C-alpha cells in the first residue's frame, strides 16, 4: 500500500510538471514592438505586450484571450476579421509569451486577463456592459475566471476545455488540475456562448458540450459539424459571423 501511494505521488508530481510544459509551449516571437503595440505593467512590475484594434462603430469590445501556441504577431493575421465584423478587440500576450516578461502560470494568466480588463475600463473607457471576454482554447481559463469575478456583457468560449488535465483524459486521475472551467460554469451569471468543432482533435468536442450543459445562465451554442480546433471561423464561413452577431446583439 505504501509503495502504491509512493508511486501515485511520483506520477502526480510528474503529471504536474508535464502539464506545465504542455500548457505553455510558448511559440517563437513573430512580431516587433512597433507603434501598433504597447505595454501594460503588472502590480509586481512585469511588462506585458498588448495590442488594441479599435473600431469606432463597435458596440462590443472583445477581450481576446488566446490559445497556448499563439502570440500577438499571430493574432494580427486574423483579429482584423473581427474588426471587419464590427467589433473592437484588445489582446495581451501572457507572461512569458511574445515580448511579455515573466513566467506563465495559471494564477499569472488570471492576473494578466484582469490587468487587460482594467485597461479597457480605466484607460480606454469601455464600460463593463460592452466588454465580452473571448476565450480560445487555453484562453478559456482566464476568460471564465474573469467573467466570474468582474461585470461583463457576456462571455464567448471557443475550443474550450472542461479542465486542463481532462484534455488528456476524461477521468481526473491526479490532484492539482488547472483551469477547472467545468466547476465554474454554473456560477457564471452573464450570457454564455460556446463554440466548438465536432472534429476538434486538440480539445475534443465533449469538452464544449459539457461546458454548455454546465452553464446555468442564458446560453447559446455553435457546434460546427466536422469543424477543427484552429481556423474554425474560416471553416464555418458566414454562418460563424452570423451566429456571433446574433449573440452579441442580444447582450
Question: What residue ranges belong to the model's regions?
Answer:
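C-terminal catalytic histidine-bearing segment of alpha/beta-hydrolase fold enzymes
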Residues: 209-213, 217-251
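An N-terminal hydrophobic leader/cap segment in hydrolases
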Residues: 2-42, 51
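Primarily recognizes the serine-hydrolase "nucleophile elbow" in alpha/beta-hydrolase
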Residues: 116-123, 128-173, 184-187
Amino acid at each position: 500500500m505504501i509503495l502504491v501511494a509512493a508511486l501515485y505521488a511520483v506520477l502526480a508530481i510528474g503529471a504536474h510538471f508535464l502539464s506545465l510544459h504542455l500548457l505553455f509551449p510558448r511559440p517563437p516571437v513573430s512580431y516587433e514592438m512597433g507603434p501598433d503595440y504597447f505595454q501594460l505593467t503588472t502590480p509586481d512590475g512585469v511588462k506585458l505586450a498588448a495590442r488594441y484594434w479599435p473600431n469606432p462603430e463597435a458596440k462590443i469590445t472583445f477581450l481576446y484571450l488566446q490559445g497556448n501556441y499563439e502570440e500577438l504577431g499571430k493574432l494580427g493575421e486574423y483579429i482584423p476579421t473581427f474588426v471587419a465584423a464590427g467589433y473592437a478587440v484588445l489582446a495581451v500576450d501572457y507572461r512569458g509569451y511574445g515580448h511579455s516578461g515573466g513566467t506563465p502560470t495559471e494564477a499569472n494568466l488570471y492576473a494578466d486577463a484582469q490587468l487587460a480588463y482594467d485597461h479597457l475600463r480605466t484607460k480606454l473607457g469601455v464600460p463593463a456592459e460592452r466588454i465580452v471576454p473571448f476565450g480560445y482554447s487555453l484562453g478559456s481559463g482566464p476568460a471564465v475566471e474573469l467573467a466570474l469575478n468582474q461585470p461583463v456583457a457576456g462571455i464567448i468560449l471557443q475550443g474550450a476545455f472542461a479542465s486542463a488535465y481532462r484534455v488528456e483524459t476524461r477521468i481526473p486521475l491526479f490532484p492539482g488540475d488547472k483551469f477547472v472551467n467545468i466547476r465554474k460554469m454554473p456560477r457564471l451569471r452573464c450570457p454564455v456562448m460556446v463554440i466548438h468543432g465536432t472534429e476538434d482533435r486538440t480539445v475534443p468536442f465533449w469538452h464544449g458540450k459539457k461546458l454548455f450543459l454546465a452553464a446555468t445562465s442564458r446560453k447559446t451554442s455553435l457546434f460546427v459539424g466536422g469543424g477543427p480546433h484552429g481556423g474554425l471561423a474560416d471553416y464555418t464561413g458566414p454562418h460563424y459571423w452570423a451566429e456571433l452577431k446574433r449573440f452579441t446583439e442580444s447582450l
